[in-house]
């Protein structure tokens, strides 16, 4: 029992010492101008993407704004504060609506002009006709070169065929000449023998 009461008393003295130490540190920090901040796991704020890009393949890409973009946005908000036209006097009120009408008219004219130019084909580059002419001439030159190449190849093929035909005729011609020559000699020899026989045969004279 005494041991248990001693342990309880020791625990109480330790707790009292801890509270006294905590109070002392808090007092010192207050004197120095510090603030006590309780540390804990704070839930991180979920960052919302500025835009989501969808691709044809089905993939998506989220684009987040950087810190510089956020700072620029804050600067723009500071530079261009929202104006309540109901609180303006007549002069600034008319000036405000004149500027708003002018900017909206310019934006509408710009949009319509771009659409009309794209429909009429005015949005083509300034020297597009020269570019088209260059590509047309280049295409004609390529076609002409192709025709020349094909004609040269056909002419070469014709010359080769002609040379082959001439060589075949030259190899066949001497055989025909020699055979005809032999035949002519043979016929001439036969004719000569017939003439000799006629000459050697005695001619009978009638009485």
Curated annotation (Swiss-Prot):
The modification N-acetylmethionine is found at residue 1. Residues 157-176 have a biased composition (Polar residues). The keyword Membrane does not apply. Residues 131-170 form a coiled coil. Residues 142-176 are annotated as: Disordered. The modification Phosphothreonine is found at residue 66. It comes from the Eukaryota. The modification Phosphoserine is found at residue 65. Keywords: Acetylation, Coiled coil, Phosphoprotein. Belongs to the FAM177 family. This is Protein FAM177A1. It comes from Mus musculus. The lineage of its organism: Eukaryota, Metazoa, Chordata, Craniata, Vertebrata.
């Amino acid at each position: 029992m005494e041991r248990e009461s001693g342990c309880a008393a020791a625990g109480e003295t330790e707790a009292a010492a801890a509270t006294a130490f905590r109070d002392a540190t808090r007092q010192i920090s207050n004197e120095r101008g510090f603030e006590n901040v309780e540390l804990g796991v704070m839930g991180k704020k979920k960052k919302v993407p500025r835009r989501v890009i969808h691709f044809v393949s089905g993939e998506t890409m989220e684009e987040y704004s950087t810190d510089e973009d956020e700072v620029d946005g804050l600067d723009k908000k500071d530079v261009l504060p929202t104006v309540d036209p109901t609180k303006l006097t007549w002069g600034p009120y008319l000036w405000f609506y004149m500027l708003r009408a002018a900017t909206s008219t310019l934006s509408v004219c710009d949009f319509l002009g771009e659409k009309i130019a794209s429909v009429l084909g005015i949005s083509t580059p300034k020297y597009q006709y020269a570019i088209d002419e260059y590509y047309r001439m280049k295409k004609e030159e390529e076609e002409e070169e192709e025709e020349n190449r094909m004609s040269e190849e056909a002419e070469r093929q014709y010359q080769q065929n002609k040379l082959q035909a001439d060589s075949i005729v030259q190899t066949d011609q001497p055989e025909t000449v020699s055979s005809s020559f032999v035949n002519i000699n043979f016929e001439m020899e036969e004719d000569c023998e017939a003439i000799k026989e006629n000459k050697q045969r005695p001619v009978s004279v009638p009485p």
